[in-house]
Amino acid sequence: MPSSVRLRVFFLFAAGYFVSYVFRGVNLGFAPLITHDLGLSAADLGLLTSLYFIGFAIAQIPVGVLLDHYGPRRVTAGMLVFAAAGIWTFGASHGLGGLMVGRLLIGIGVSVCLSAAFKASAQHFPVARLPLVNGFTMAVGGLGGVVVGSPLASLLQTTTWRQVSIGLGVFTLVVAAAIALFAPRNADSHHQADVISQFKGTWHILKSGAFWKIASFSVVTQGVFYAMQSLWIRPYLLDVMNLTPAHAAALVSVLGFAMMLGCVGFGAAARGMERRGVSVYAFCGVGMALYVLVQVLMVLRVPLPPATLLAAYGVFGGTGILSYAVMAEYFPSHMIGRATTTLTLVIFLLIFGFQVGVGAVLSHWTPEGGHYPAVAHVTVWSILIALQLASAVWYVLPSRVLHKTRRTAS
């Protein structure tokens, strides 16, 4: 296959994932503005932002069926139209109800982007190159986490959040049109699939002891990381570290860059460590443990530069993504797709729960001048750290449920 076709596939579908990542974190910049304009509480803000993740989660199984039946080109282009409609609904709303509908539509609309990118890559790239290609796809998506930091903050100095919403909708339609027009048509699928079978497969995975052994630590750390990165890290920087809004926005971008480096770096290092006798399961566990350690250091307010702490938070925050590779080692090939889809589903449900929960806990304190007391944030972070430590115990305990699957040559 010509390299130009492969590059076209990569950039088109990576652009789709970039769009989904921007939508994931855009409320970081919007939050103080919509809170002021519409009088939202922290609980309202947490629920509103988390609807992206619940929309993403509930769409996973139907999206998997659509991808198998129609292929990534048509499904991605069509679903992104819903995302554009969602952000326009969001930007035009003058009450919490309209904002919630818009945010839910966005989550549903972009729910296909990452899975479609992985599927399109699998159709056009050699298997040996997929880990690297998928890592770069994650990195391009991570640029969205950079954009919602300083660039978005600067843009909001000269325009309104409603105008930015209109622009995001237009950009989303441009990406959708590019995928529809320029992605290869010959890779569209026509496999028969049904939602009932997918639900049965998901339920089978959820009853698996091996799944929960592998997923226990990663779903909690990933849930915490993305819940904080997409909303609550900025208030922490402002209220606890006493940073200026501009400094906080810059550190959000630092976190995004660090996460990109972490995803690519840990993905590349994992197989090298495995050749040295360190399993991907153990390597992933060490990375997640370091992520928890960074959170402890932040809560204790150790005298380190904020940029150093946020960079470490980003680098180690994404290491749980290695659990997808671990799943492939312990589930037979015909179950890997369902195992990874189920893992994504659980992670996004937890992100939803954590975002709502953080907002609910913060709302027990009365904000002063738009800021919550430091003790409120420390309480939230301490609870989240405790949950991660509890899940880590299950992850490291000896188990008889993990047995690597032997792959037979085909």
Language model segments and positions:
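Juxtamembrane intracellular "pre-TM" segments in multi-pass secondary transporters
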Residues: M1-P2, R185-A215
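Helix-breaking motifs and short loop linkers at transmembrane-helix boundaries and internal kinks
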Residues: G39, G71, A92-G98, P126, ...
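Helix-loop-helix hairpin linking two adjacent transmembrane segments in secondary transporters
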Residues: F136-R185
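Helix-to-loop junctions at the C-terminal end of transmembrane segments
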Residues: A59-G71, C263-V278, L362
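Cytoplasmic helix-loop-helix junction between adjacent transmembrane helices
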Residues: G102-V140
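Extracytoplasmic gate region of multi-pass secondary transporters
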Residues: N27-L28, G209-F266, A328, I351-G359
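Conserved MFS/SLC helix-loop-helix module at the cytosolic interface between two early adjacent transmembrane helices
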Residues: I58-G97
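Extracytoplasmic
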Residues: R8-A42, I58, M228-R234, F354-G359
